[in-house]
Amino acid sequence: EGYLQASEGKICQWQKILHDDVEKLRVGLVWAGAPHKEIREAEIADRRRSMSLTTLAPLAACSANVSFYSLQLGEPASQLATPPAGLNIIDHTARLHSFDDTAALISCLDLVIAVDTSTAHLAAALGKTVWLLSRYDQCWRWLSHRTDTPWYASLKIYQQTRPLDWSTPVNAIQQDLLHHSAQQID
C-alpha cells in the first residue's frame, strides 16, 4: 500500500491513452538520473547511479509479455532515438508536465524498473512495485546488503556486485521479469 495518490482525473486520462495495451505487463523504465552539473559531488554520484539505455538491452528478451514505457526525462531520454534491438519503448513523456502527471502514468503501470531517482521514490510511495537498480556503493538510505527497504514495502533492490558493472543486476531483473510477466499473463 502506498501513502501517495495521483489525481483521479489524470489517472482516468492515462487509462484512456493506455486502454488498448491490456494484454501485456506494463513496465516503466528510468535508466538515468539528473546529473546536477552545478554540484560536483552530485555529478560524480550520478555517473555511478546512471546507465545508458543500451545497458537494459537484456530486457528485450521479455518483450513478448511486456510493454515498456519510458519515464525517463532530460537529456538521457534522447537515447530513445536508438534503443537496443528488440527493446521497443513507448514514450509518452511529452505529456508529463508535472510530478502529478508522472504519478498518474505510474499508477496505470504494473511495475517500475529504475535507477535511484525521484521517480523510483514516487512509484514506491504510490505503492507500485519498484525494482531499483542500485550502484555498488549504494546510497545510505538503502542500508547495506539488503534487497528490501524499511521505507517502501513494494521496492526491491538489485545492487551492483562490482563498481560500474550493471550486468549482474540487469540480468537478475531480466530473469525476474521473465518469470513475473509469464505469471501475470497466464
Residue ranges, per PLM feature:
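Catalytic machinery of carbohydrate-active enzymes
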Residues: 1-186
